[in-house]
Amino acid sequence: MIRCLRLKVEGALEQIFTMAGLNIRDLLRDILRRWRDENYLGMVEGAGMFIEEIHPEGFSLYVHLDVRAVCLLEAIVQHLTNAIICSLAVEFDHATGGERVHLIDLHFEVLDNLLE
């Protein structure tokens, strides 16, 4: 079953990463690619993403997941969210020499499949 997730990223967060010499969009693509290849619990049959511009507020990351068991969707979304937050925090820490960034507001909304 295909589900669509939306992650809204504020423009201020994107600017903070840019000032640290990082491209948050590229980081999110890489994180999602690694997460998809890891295939948490073998429950994800496919995953794709695209970015929608929302000027000047930032952008939205849409992730389309083909999951085997909808009952595990909440656990899969939580695992993906944790992977994104932890990976972004580590990348920011390395790029800034130990600075921290507030990422707790990053969370996915589960939407109906936008492709159907």
Curated annotation (Swiss-Prot):
The keyword Cell inner membrane does not apply. Keywords: Early protein. InterPro entries: Mastadenovirus_E4/Orf3 (IPR009699), Mastadenovirus_E4/Orf3_sf (IPR038368). GO terms for molecular function: identical protein binding. This is Probable early E4 11 kDa protein.
